[in-house]
Amino acid sequence: MANFNDLNVIPDRGLSTDQSARVHMANYGDGYEQRVAAGINNLPEEWSLTWNNRSNADANKVIKFLEDEAGVTAFDWYPPDTEISSTATGASDNKLIDSAQTFTKRYLNTTVTDSTSPTPQTATVTSVDSATQLTLSANIISNGEAYTINPYKKYKCSTWNVTTPVLGYKNISATFIRVFEP
């Protein structure tokens, strides 16, 4: 699977995300209302990204990637500043415990890497137990060990725009839409 982060072309600051929970709602005559999540993947997200005044070389990397995926094939990506590098503050089988973090559902199904091992091991986050504890697919983290979480999710991009403000440079705007697939 293609990974957008491998391009090493970081979007401009000021990127934004839109999230709108999908909810089934039943309204009753007396003003009573019932709500339930619409499926298990009810938090879609769209990211508005820009790369302004980028050299043709960097811009062409982004354009080629988007053209290769053609809005059809999902790719891995995680937004800038969402990667976590920290040290575990507790230990338990198949758990990552870090009292300095605030884990959210955003980290479900992401990759955790044991940063201190000479041959780094990885595991997948299978459950967010609390704001400070994650359940992992393998027992790779011990108390005091450094780790990194790369919160990769799958996205598609079927809309992008390219302009050339001056020769040799390009502006690109794109919308990354999260897709829910294995």
Language model features with spans:
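Extracellular/virion structural assembly segments
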Residues: 1-84, 145-182
